[in-house]
């Protein structure tokens, strides 16, 4: 396997390193070392700098405001930012650029691309995702939110839950049932809905770590243009699966770098507590190291698929299982190392839910407990590990489908 990058990608890497050196201060520890209000201010400054340098969406086509580069350059940029401990993008950007933006490029109409993509890049449109409902989580096709066509508008009524970035968004992409007479996976449509209207109410949800990273969204006679359907009316399931493929595979470019950085933090924790020679701890650290290497080579595999024009597809399920199960396991090990110290008086945590703590995050019990609690969600959101294993078994290995409960009765 040749894992070297071509000369043009390495030249782009040099450009990114120059940008990092110019915009991050000397001795930069990472945004995790900043108080929350300073972290947010610096992240906004970083976003403006990225936009000014044309680095917000380098692999999007130039006609829609992107850089027109290949996925390889996108990976190079992500690698260098991860190594430098650059601020993570806001959740709205991750949802708008990585997920919805790429889905619009793949499936959207020309009018949708020209209207929405520039506004996503500028930050004028801030997006959240409206998939899960109180009665439809892992069984996403059971959504009950209704969409009814009224002239040239869709009228939407329903209740979404576990909505990331809902409190900071002004648009939501969602699944709604537009044909209740159709089969469960049909009759769904993928709609783009403005949130700045009387029929949309957002209520934050406080999680176990005391942060409000999710929310509920209530839609009562909310309206959106009839043209704001991505894909075909009634074929929203297919559009949603395309988007979830981008979500499940979106972390692999930097997962090995991010988790390797945090593995070093875990090793430091073990040394500080005098447990780095304990056989059980060493076995856990070795397991973590092996999984980081698996993520690294899995990333090369996914990059190869992207460069040949293949969407993530069902293989994204493998990626999602690997990093989410690793996240849970290494935070378990951290709390084992801390012992009763992990249950002591709470100090400042890491400021919210993140896939991987930002560079510079303190090696404190409070931060590790925040990570432990959030790691539980990582094996559930974007499709639970059980669902991912079903996808791997049925769609990649060709195993028989799991029996449905009604068939067993």
Curated annotation (Swiss-Prot):
Keywords: FAD, Flavoprotein, Oxidoreductase. Coiled coil: none annotated. Its cofactor is FAD. Induction: Repressed by Mce3R. One of its GO terms (cellular component) is peptidoglycan-based cell wall. InterPro entries: Acyl-CoA_Oxase/DH_mid-dom, Acyl-CoA_Oxase/DH_mid-dom_sf, AcylCo_DH-like_C, AcylCo_DH/oxidase_C, AcylCoA_DH/ox_N, AcylCoA_DH/ox_N_sf, AcylCoA_DH/oxidase_NM_dom_sf, Mycobact_Acyl-CoA_DH. Its EC number is 1.3.99.-. CDD domains: ACAD_fadE6_17_26. One of its GO terms (molecular function) is oxidoreductase activity, acting on the CH-CH group of donors. It comes from the Bacteria. PANTHER family: ACYL-COA DEHYDROGENASE, ACYL-COA DEHYDROGENASE FADE29. Belongs to the acyl-CoA dehydrogenase family. This is Putative acyl-CoA dehydrogenase FadE17. It comes from Mycobacterium tuberculosis (strain ATCC 25618 / H37Rv). The lineage of its organism: Bacteria, Bacillati, Actinomycetota, Actinomycetes, Mycobacteriales.
């Amino acid at each position: 396997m040749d894992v070297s990058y071509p000369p043009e990608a390495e030249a782009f890497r040099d450009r990114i390193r120059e940008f990092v050196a110019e915009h991050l201060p000397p001795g930069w520890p990472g945004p995790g070392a900043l108080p929350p209000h300073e972290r947010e201010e610096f992240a906004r400054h970083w976003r403006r700098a990225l936009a000014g340098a044309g680095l917000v969406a380098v692999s999007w086509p130039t006609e829609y405001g992107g850089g027109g580069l290949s996925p390889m350059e996108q990976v190079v940029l992500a690698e260098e930012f991860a190594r430098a401990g650059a601020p993570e993008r806001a959740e709205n950007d991750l949802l708008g650029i990585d997920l919805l933006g790429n889905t619009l490029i793949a499936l959207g109409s020309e009018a949708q691309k020209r209207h929405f993509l520039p506004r996503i890049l500028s930050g004028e449109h801030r997006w959240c995702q409206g998939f899960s409902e109180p009665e439809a989580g892992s069984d996403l096709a059971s959504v009950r939110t209704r969409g009814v066509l009224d002239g040239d508008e869709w009228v939407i009524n329903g209740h979404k839950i576990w909505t990331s970035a809902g409190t900071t968004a002004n648009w939501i992409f969602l699944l709604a049932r537009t044909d209740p007479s159709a089969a469960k996976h049909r009759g769904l449509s993928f709609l783009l809905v403005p949130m700045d209207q009387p029929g949309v109410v957002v209520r934050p949800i406080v999680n176990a770590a005391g942060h409000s990273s999710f929310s509920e969204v209530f839609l009562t006679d909310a309206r959106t243009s009839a043209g704001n359907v991505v894909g075909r009316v009634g074929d929203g399931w297919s559009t949603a699966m395309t988007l979830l493929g981008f979500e499940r595979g979106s972390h692999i470019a930097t997962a090995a770098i991010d988790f390797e950085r945090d593995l070093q933090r875990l090793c430091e924790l073990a040394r500080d507590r005098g447990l780095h020679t304990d056989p059980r701890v060493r076995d856990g650290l070795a397991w973590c190291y092996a999984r980081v290497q698996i993520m690294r080579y899995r990333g090369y595999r996914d990059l190869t698929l992207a460069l040949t024009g293949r969407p993530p597809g069902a293989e994204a399920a493998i990626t999602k299982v690997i990093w989410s199960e690793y996240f849970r396991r290494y935070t378990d090990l951290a709390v084992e190392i801390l012992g009763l110290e992990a249950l002591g008086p709470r100090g400042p945590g890491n400021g919210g839910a993140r896939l991987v703590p930002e560079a510079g995050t303190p090696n404190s019990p409070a931060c590790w407990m925040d990570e432990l609690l959030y790691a539980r969600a990582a094996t559930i959101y974007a499709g639970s590990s059980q669902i991912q294993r079903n996808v791997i078994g049925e769609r990649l290995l060709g195993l028989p489908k799991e029996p449905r409960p009604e068939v067993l009765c």
